[in-house]
């Protein structure tokens, strides 16, 4: 069975805003909220920049569930609840087994791991807290979304570093296409702003000291953030039967592996994923008006991605709009491409392409139209790139229904 899959609700929170509407407002207007991290103890990393959620919005998650949740699970449940509310859906005994969830994340519960190490190694505590294992496991976000919303269909976590959000959405689309579910909540969540994670990224020598400047000649690296982005996916038939508002269609999926290096990017893997996505969506290269780039702000990644885009799109690469919204919401790892899904859906809805913020100097190696600093009004079909360490690549295509 091969069914069309549409998006009927979105939800999210990150340092730009605590719901999808406020995130999109900031993306559309183009400011960057990246600043020194203040809500966690950084010790020797004091002054490191990032994009943090300074206050969690109000929610009605019961305390009994909260005590077993890491921060990344909390963000996932809040975003998923918003998406379900916009979609106008709820679970009951009749439909729960046809509703599922696929949650992408970059790693385990970083907060839980750091808290445990500190309490035992520094504070002299002899035992870990009772919920340490279930709080920290990567699949916890999917489980908590399922528990809170009553989803009893396919429920699982997807861990593929920076491509996890797109991989989760792709996997959820497959569940619907194959008839295993009618509705899937899908996206990504991550809360990596802990001392241990930042220290690990510092060791890679890719953290920017000031801000994220994708494709700009003076770019200096990645800035990390935290957040979650979620979409309610439905079969077209299911959404139409209940008169739902369809925000966009997931038109195509492209997946690939580099089989090259654990950290260095290759051109061939991303190229293959983009070509596969176009083929799955039955699109020609010139059908794509907007490409939300992976665009991390590192020298190597941005040059590689530019070269791969040129290979796939040819002359059209110079005519379409490209931007990296990581310049605004930072790199939220497992949540990154899920937040970028929100950008693509809203770009289709409003006919506005979000800019690449913080852009200052053209780079001859990154010579595409990267929509520098100012949003652009343009009706568009869109694609979203996600290329992760380890060479795991996931590309999605979206179009108006």
From Swiss-Prot:
Gene Ontology, cellular component aspect: plasma membrane
Enzyme Commission (EC) number: 2.3.1.-
Where's it found, cell-wise?
A: Cell inner membrane
Which GO biological process annotations does it have?
A: fatty acid biosynthetic process
* Gene3D superfamilies the record matches: 3.40.47.10
Q: Which residues form the signal peptide?
A: none
The principal location of this protein is: membrane
- Give the annotated active site: 162, 294, 331
Report domain Ketosynthase family 3 (KS3) positions: 2-400
- Where do transmembrane segments lie in this chain? 329-348
Query: Could you tell me the keywords of this UniProt record?
Result: Cell inner membrane, Cell membrane, Membrane, Nodulation, Plasmid, Transferase, Transmembrane, Transmembrane helix
GO MF term (any one):
3-oxoacyl-[acyl-carrier-protein] synthase activity
Q: Which family does it belong to?
A: Belongs to the thiolase-like superfamily. Beta-ketoacyl-ACP synthases family.
What is this protein's function per UniProt?
A: Proposed to synthesize NOD factor fatty acyl chain. Involved in the synthesis of a highly unsaturated fatty acid moiety, which forms part of a lipo-oligosaccharide that is responsible for host specificity.
The protein's name is: Nodulation protein E
To which species is this protein native?
Rhizobium leguminosarum bv. trifolii
